[in-house]
């Protein structure tokens, strides 16, 4: 009976831990979302390791920020187009989310998580120009936060 009680307590504790972790995993629901670029922002591609994750294992990410002149009229159209593109590559995607001047699409394929961001930049002359940001991670989604983008891209702010 004592062994059974201890076992049940262990099961309850494990269930509690799993529930807490499951809640923490929702990192794709951004609360800091609208992207702000400095006036002298330069498009760039960054390759490297996510802070503190490279402890004996390779965790690779790619970040691309580029001016993107779209023939798509709205952020939602851009998001739908990116979603379709990811699904064509075998990714399971969330519905595109539009908030403020930003749209993002998240897709997962095995252990690869891809994010597409597009930012409507009022400073760009063409109404149909976006600055696109592509973020690809091959690591456990629960281990990172959106704030890492700000560390990787000097001058980028999410608010």
Predicted regions: what is each one?
Residues 7-18:
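Sec-dependent N-terminal signal peptides
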Residues 23, 39-42, 83, 130-159:
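Surface-exposed amphipathic alpha-helical segments
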Residues 60-65, 103, 130-133:
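Surface-exposed aromatic
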Residues 29-77, 108-111:
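Secretory pathway targeting signatures of secreted, lumenal, and periplasmic proteins
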Residues 22-29:
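Cleaved targeting-peptide boundary
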Residues 25, 49-51, 101-104:
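A generic structural signal for beta-strand entry/edge sites
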Residues 80-129:
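Signature of long, low-cysteine stretches enriched in small and polar/charged residues
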Residues 1-4:
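Short, Lys/Arg-enriched N-terminal segments with co-localized hydrophobic residues
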